[in-house]
Amino acid sequence: MPFKNSFNLKYITARGRWYDYSWKGDTKKSGGLATNIGIHFFDMLLWIFGNVKENNVTYRDDKTISGFLKLEKANVNWFLSCDYDKLPQSIKDKNQRAYRIMTLDNQEIDFSDGFTDLHTISYQEILKGNGFSIDETIPSIALVHEITNKNI
């Protein structure tokens, strides 16, 4: 059996009360947390570690969702939340509202900073014709759809 990487994703980006009343807080309009804050990570994971072999959702409420994926080249534990109460106290103490950690084979990567202009740059590239094709995006969209609608 080939070696499988161990990958963990913990992504918490606290949202204010507005979130509950906006289209982003409505799963029917936004696709839910897996789509809203997770799509880019699931896309990256599939690109790096291959196709989904197993998909388990272990927890879901209005502000948090978590699960486990078996991909061709990695076992992935993931946790997504927009709940301020889920932030580590050390992050709250610094008056920060985001905690983004990836761990690959016990090596931790903190990417809590650096997201400021990411969407703007992405949209600019799309307008230049440098977007992705439907065929390239289908696996990620199918995965987040399954995650959002999977029975626990």
Which functions belong to the PLM regions below?
Residues F41-F42, H119, V144:
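A general structural signal for well-ordered alpha-helical segments in protein cores
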Residues M1-K53:
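Predominantly a Rossmann-like dinucleotide-binding segment in NAD(P)-dependent oxidoreductases
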Residues D62-D117:
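C-terminal substrate-binding/catalytic lobe of Rossmann-fold NAD(P)-dependent oxidoreductases
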Residues Q124-I152:
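C-terminal helix-rich "cap/oligomerization" subdomain common to oxidoreductases
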Residues W47-N55, L80-K86:
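Short Pro/Gly-enriched beta-strand edge/turn motifs at strand-loop
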Residues T35, I39, T116, G131:
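Electropositive phosphate-/nucleotide-binding environments in soluble metabolic enzymes
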Residues L118-Q124:
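Conserved C-terminal active-site "lid" loop/helix of NAD(P)H-dependent oxidoreductases
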